[in-house]
């Protein structure tokens, strides 16, 4: 599947099914027009811990006539760029370096990573301290990625440490071809102003993270466009991160797709629709059909 001449890769919550079912799900994606999968964060954590799993995964992907094309880095406070705990930083950086090697070895072009919000959410750690930690992490990772030919893609999210401004700060600081942005359309929609949008309707998670008043960011794509190398595509109602099918929420898809098609450094786009949320009522086939229609 292609979008404006760029490959489309598909996310799936593999942790909720047994390995015996992996190939069937891969074949279902293939039979509905997909040909590329994302190495999701759970897969990469498993690969780092179990080389036999990596070999088995390569075999299953080959037998299903699919390809691996993107990586989502392991995430959480112990993996995020902004990890400040010195006892964890060494293993975290080494883990990402190994993961980048696996990304290159499998032919994956992008490595999406989070700045991270866990430390802020739990301890209200000062954002300048988190920013400095993220810079130090990227000081180590960017030269490594450049040697491997993989682009680290920093993802925008919806918490104070992960705003478009914070992403831009990191990208402009390094100004490296090995560092770009993963534009997350769903996250941007949660943070975007819209006619009639009301602060009191934000979900409890957003209210707590922002201490009761969400600072909204208009036109995140326009601001990030020069740096966008890949994108996470999913929908929501503007108030919570639902990872729903495009068309089921309030994302303005014609505007977003037009903007993505014009991004000068775009490598790929990704479906990040979540099948593990009952309210989404989606299957691999339904996801593929929706994206095929969206890109037609």
Which residues does each PLM region occupy?
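N-terminal pre-domain/capping segments
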Residues: 1-105, 139, 176, 180, ...
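A cross-domain feature marking catalytic cores of carbohydrate-active enzymes
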Residues: 5-14, 39-43, 70-75, 113-115, ...
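Charged helix-capping and loop-helix junction motifs
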Residues: 20-21, 50-56, 89, 93-96, ...
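Active-site acidic/histidine proton-transfer and metal-coordination neighborhood
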Residues: 24, 60-63, 82-183, 190
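Conserved, mostly hydrophobic/aromatic
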Residues: 29, 61, 92, 103, ...
């Amino acid at each position: 599947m292609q979008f404006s001449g760029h490959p489309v890769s598909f996310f799936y919550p593999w942790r909720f099914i047994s390995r015996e079912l992996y190939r069937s799900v891969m074949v279902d994606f293939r039979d509905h027009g997909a040909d590329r999968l994302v190495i999701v964060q759970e897969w990469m954590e498993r690969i780092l811990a179990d080389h036999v799993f990596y070999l088995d995964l390569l075999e299953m992907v080959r037998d299903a006539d699919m390809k691996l094309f993107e990586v989502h880095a392991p995430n959480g406070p112990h993996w995020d760029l902004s990890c400040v705990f010195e006892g964890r930083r060494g293993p975290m950086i080494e883990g990402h370096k190994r993961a980048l090697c696996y990304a290159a070895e499998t032919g994956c072009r992008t490595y999406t990573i989070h700045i991270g919000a866990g430390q802020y959410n739990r301890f209200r750690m000062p954002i300048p301290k988190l920013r400095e930690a993220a810079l130090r992490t990227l000081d180590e990772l960017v030269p490594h990625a450049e040697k491997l030919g993989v682009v680290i893609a920093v993802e925008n999210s919806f918490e104070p440490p992960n705003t478009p401004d914070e992403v831009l700060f990191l990208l402009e600081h390094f100004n490296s071809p090995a560092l770009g942005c993963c534009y997350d359309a769903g996250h941007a929609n949660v943070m975007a102003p819209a006619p009639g949008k009301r602060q009191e309707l934000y979900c409890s998670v957003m209210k707590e993270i922002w201490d009761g008043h969400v600072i909204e960011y208009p036109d995140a794509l326009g601001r990030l466009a020069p740096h966008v190398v890949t994108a996470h595509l999913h929908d929501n109602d503007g108030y919570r991160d639902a990872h729903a099918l495009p068309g089921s929420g309030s994302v303005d898809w014609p505007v977003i797709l037009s903007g993505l098609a014009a991004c000068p450094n775009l490598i790929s786009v990704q479906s990040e629709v979540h099948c593990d949320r009952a309210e989404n009522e989606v299957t691999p086939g339904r996801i593929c059909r929706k994206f095929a229609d969206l890109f037609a």
